[in-house]
Each structure stands twice: as C-alpha cells, then as structure tokens.
A protein has these predicted regions:
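Noncatalytic, beta-rich nucleic-acid-contacting surfaces in large DNA/RNA-processing enzymes
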Residues: 1-291, 295-297
Length: 299
C-alpha cells in the first residue's frame, strides 16, 4: 500500500495537470472555432446560457463589437430564446418578456409554424388561443415592440383611448379577436360548416395619436425586457459623449481604487450615465449621505 501511494503521488505531479490542460485546450479550440466561423449561432447560445441581465447586457455589447446585430422581439420571427435569423442577426426571444407565460409562447410559435406568419394584429388575435395569450401578454408584447412588424399601428395607439370612449385600441382588438373566434367555433360546430351568408365582423378602427417619445418607448421596453432594445436614453447626448472625454463607468471602476490611494492627482474624470438606484446611508458620525448607482451604455 505504501509503494502504491508513493508511485501515485509522484505520478500525480504531472499526469493530473497535463490531462486537464489537454481537455481545456481542446474546449478552447472548439470555442474559438465556433466563435470565428459561426459567430451568430455561438453568441446566441452564449446569451441563452446567461442567468442574469447584467451578463446578458455584457455579451450583447460583445455582439455589438463583433458586428452582430441583436434585435428586439418580433412576433413573426422570435422563438422562445435568443435565435439567429436568416441574415445572421440575433433575435430576442419571447421567453425573456415579463408577463408572457410558457403557454402563450408555445401557442404563438406553434400557430405561426403551422399556418405561416401573422399578417397583422387582427390576424394574430383571430388565430392565437386567447385563453393562452391574454390581455396582459398582449400588453407586454406591445411594450417590447414585438408587433412593430405590423406598420399599420405604432405602440402608443394600442393604449390610446378616444375621448368619450371607455376602451383603448388594444381592448378593441382583443374584443374583435374574441368575437371572431366565437363565430369560427360556432360555424365549425354546425351541420353544414361555413355558410355563404355567415356573419362578417369588420375590423375596429384604431384612432391615430402621437407616438411615444424615445424616453417613454425605452422605459416600457426596459420594464418588460430588462434592457433598452430600440436605443438608449443617452443617445440624446451623443455629441457630448463623443467630445467631452467621457470615461466609461467600467473603466472608472477599474481605476478608482488607485485614485483613492493618490494616483493621478489633479486629473479630472468625467462619467455619464443613468442613475438606476439611490441608497440613503449614514456615516459613523450620524451624517446622512446618498450613494447613487449610475449605468452607462457599456454596463
């Protein structure tokens, strides 16, 4: 037993490390090959593997650096998770939307794959099961921009209520879909099927209104996706960000410890971002202060 232990102890000094280094080298080669030759597919798999929004945002920035577009959700293209389209772009998945459940996602994708793309919002509400895709799901889809592929309406129109009416555009659309599905079910159950004189329900007219501002649109997007998809609030300040020597928050966090220790005394650093959280704290001497948490485009 002593001899076996001594032999294995000496063997383990090199065999264990070499075997692991070989395996890691092989995995690294596979990863590099996939990223170089199948960048869209590789990065969509990486995004699907991430468990929190900060890591997803980080890898979306990597996609941007690689020249790969990450597009918002689309009712005629999105799958459950991130997926690559025919152009090599990555499409945001319906599974990442708050308020859209598993049954709704399955119903939307299954119907689309079976009977083709949805022609417009009215075709959509006629075809999907409203027991699965309820009003809450529809609201989240609108907020996320999933219906932007239907150019007839912009997002604000779905929530606009005309003076003197009690329902907004989306509620009119939902009611239309319910009536059409009821008529379809009733016709199917008749002895002779669909009759030439079957009732026709006209599509409701959705009143025009002003579109949302960029800030409103982005805030709604972030509410349901966890991130800004169509742009960024700092897009209003592109000139300032470009010409005022702005330091990214990520870089500033890397060097701030050195600044505290006295390095680069007299040098000024400018950062620009959105304050996403503010914590109110108290010092040991009972002085109140606030600690903001800013975020820029790269964080």
């Amino acid at each position: 037993l002593e001899k076996i232990w001594t032999d294995w102890e000496a063997f383990a000094q090199y065999a264990f490390n070499k075997s692991h280094s070989t395996c890691y080298a092989f995995v690294a080669y596979q990863t590099a090959y996939l990223k170089a030759h199948y960048p869209g597919e590789y990065m969509s798999a990486v995004l699907n593997h991430q468990g929190n929004i900060e890591k997803i945002t980080f890898f979306m920035e990597e996609c941007k650096r690689m020249g790969i577009k990450v597009l918002g959700p689309d009712i005629n293209e999105s799958l459950k998770g991130f997926a690559v389209n025919a152009k090599g772009e990555i499409r945001f998945g319906l599974g990442g939307l708050k308020g859209v459940g598993e049954m709704a996602i399955e119903s939307i994708i299954t119907e689309r794959q079976k009977n083709g793309p949805y022609l417009d919002i009215f075709d959509f509400v006629q075809r999907v099961l409203q027991k699965s895709v309820n009003k809450k799901s529809l609201e989240s889809l609108v907020y996320s921009g999933a219906f932007d592929c239907f150019p007839e309406l912009h997002r604000a129109q779905y929530f606009h209520t005309v003076d003197g009416e009690r329902v907004n555009g989306l509620e009119k659309i939902v009611n239309y879909g319910q009536v059409q599905q009821s008529l379809s079910a009733g016709t199917t159950n008749t002895l002779f099927g669909e009759l030439p004189g079957a009732m026709h329900v006209p599509k409701p007219k959705i009143a025009p209104c002003d579109p949302w501002t960029l800030t409103e649109l982005l805030n709604y997007e972030k509410e349901v996706t966890g991130m800004f998809m169509s742009g960024h609030p700092l897009d209003h300040f592109k000139f300032e960000l470009k010409h005022y020597e702005i330091t990214s928050i990520a870089l500033f966090n890397e060097i701030k410890d050195a600044l505290v220790e006295g390095a680069s005394l007299g040098k000024m650093y400018r950062v620009a971002g959105l304050v996403t959280d503010v914590q109110h704290r108290m010092t040991k001497t009972c002085l109140l202060y606030t600690s903001p948490s800013p975020r820029d485009r790269q964080k």
